[in-house]
Amino acid sequence: MQPLLPKLEGLRVVPQLGRIDAKSIAQTDQLILVLPERPKEALLRRIPGGRNLAAALKKRRAGSRPAALTRADNARQTLVVVGTNKPGTEAFERLSFARKLLAAATTEKAGILGIAVQGFTEEAHDELLEALVAAALAAGTPLPEWKQKASPRSIRSVRLLGLDKKPELDRVRAEARGNHLARWLTMLPPNKLDVDAYANVARAIADDKGWDFQRFDTARLEELGAGAFLAVAQGNGDD
């Protein structure tokens, strides 16, 4: 039986300071590598397997997402998913870009997912990294299922590679937990999440967070002149 509230612990995200190298890549099963649209040769030389990356990027089609797929020369044969982007893209575009790269990286058995953003200004780097972490958190959290055996997770954990500083991800994690809760509740069927169950969910969240909780019946909504809420409430048989 599915619980009404999901576990919101989320994926483990480990930042790794220092230059991206063969050792750090070898600790991942899949790696998402984001580069500028036209990466300079000097940048590619600093990245392990840069020669193979350059060759793969030459074969890409314009606008393809991902731009290239290759394998690292290590024991895990790390799948490297390369995406190219330009600074100044809107938040929605960055998230859409990140989701496409995540989809390409999670076709294999779940493992340690590496994420590296290289060759950008600090601001552009942070924006792209946040979008990729948000997409990974969304992809790696379970949703309600009605099967005897739960589907395997697509990601076990996340490592952020090639960082100059520890990223500020508290907001990204909080938004991911909120989005996960909303998606979870949306997917519960009406026979599981009826009016009373929804109220109990709201009360449980309020108790956990130390918030006040009050439930209004239709008579009270009429007194308050809350027409929009009243219209919704009148569609339910339970007052």
What would you call each of these model-derived segments?
Residues 1-239:
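Short amphipathic alpha-helical segment within the helicase RecA-like ATPase core
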